[in-house]
Amino acid sequence: MKTREEALALDRDDPLAPLREQFALPAGVIYLDGNSLGAQPRAAAARAQQVIGAEWGEGLIRSWNTAGWFALPRRLGDRLAPLIGAADGEVAITDTISINLFKLLAAMLRHQARHAPKRRVIVSERSNFPTDLYIAQGLIAQFDRDYELRLIDDPADLPDALDDETAVAMITHVNYRTGYMHDMPSVTQTVRQAGALMLWDLAHSAGAVPVDLNGALADGAVGCTYKYLNGGPGSPAFVWVPKRHQRAFEQPLSGWWGHRAPFAMQPAFEPDPGIARFLCGTQPIVSMSMVECGLDVFAQTDMHAIRRKSLALTDAFVALVESRCAGQPLKLVTPRAHHQRGSQASFEHPHGYEVMQALIARGVIGDYREPRILRFGFTPLYTRFVDVWDAVETLRDILDTEAWRAPEFATRAAVT
């Protein structure tokens, strides 16, 4: 792609192009931050009005039954399941990634303590998203026995970090900063052969790249719905537990929604035999209902078509940045190899924060991550090839004119 006309031609031939019309995208904005917060499906506003105005406003408490609120975490989990290689009854939409990670990691450690008590080590990556590491650290602090969080600095170091004391490997499939994507089947096999359990974080994978959790024989996973799945800001996350583990995994947040018969009001907790045991308290129905609007769009295509366009978009973006912005101090930190790349492109720049603020001021919205990383997410449901061209041209102008040096772009916002 060497001209804007070529970009427009690619958009005309794009089989996913009609899906863009199902999103409410503001005029004059090129949105390359769907890896942080997905765009709003047009159906979301009407769905919110239905839930608030009709189901809550008129149905009141009856809507737990008549509008299907009570079954919503499991019903939407079944709708999400095909996107991550899961079966019906294996996914629940609930809580946040952090909370679900606490539940699932604790369940895995408890399982290992019963069957292999010597295994007290959690292996993860130092570059993992911080909340994953914080949750592991906080969980370890709750135990009265010696548990350890062992961090590796390179994916190639994983085999050497696994031993007969490893309980769980907790890995994020696509790295939030660089976009590096692990080989899920290979990593899972390595971990399981070492006798450990494999826990995947799919925050930057679900809805972005094809995932086959059951095919890989993974042991558990968590993920969010507000990024590529377009569920809305703060929309509930999800937890996946394969059926082979559901009865054996006991999570510690034993709230009433995880009880086998919540409305029996029994004084002793008896976990649900299925995925519902990973629920805890009353669910956020309004925000959870919005998740379905994003899933409705995914139902009109498949992950392989999304992946083909994702790779084409990121290939074009990287090539254009390196040609149109040649001579600028930009360093690609995202893998070039397709099998190692998620759906983002990240570049390091000495003044990355200021450059990103200048881009946002001109309507090109990406985001910034420490240290010095310009991060661009590509969401094939609504990102166009002409967006790629125009974004790079804006970046080139900002760098050539040093517009990023304006004082206002150095002011740090609370959210970057």
From Swiss-Prot:
Domain of life: Bacteria
One protein family per Pfam: KYNU_C
GO molecular function: kynureninase activity; pyridoxal phosphate binding
One example of a Gene Ontology biological process annotation: anthranilate metabolic process
Membrane-spanning residues: none
Cofactor: pyridoxal 5'-phosphate
Keyword Repeat: no
Top enzyme class: hydrolase
GO cellular component: cytoplasm
Binding site for pyridoxal 5'-phosphate: 97-98, 129-132, 172, 201, 204, 226, 256, 282
Coiled coil residues, start to end: none
PANTHER family linked: KYNURENINASE
Entry-linked HAMAP family: Kynureninase
Binding partners and assembly: Homodimer.
Name this protein carries in UniProt: Kynureninase
Gene: kynU
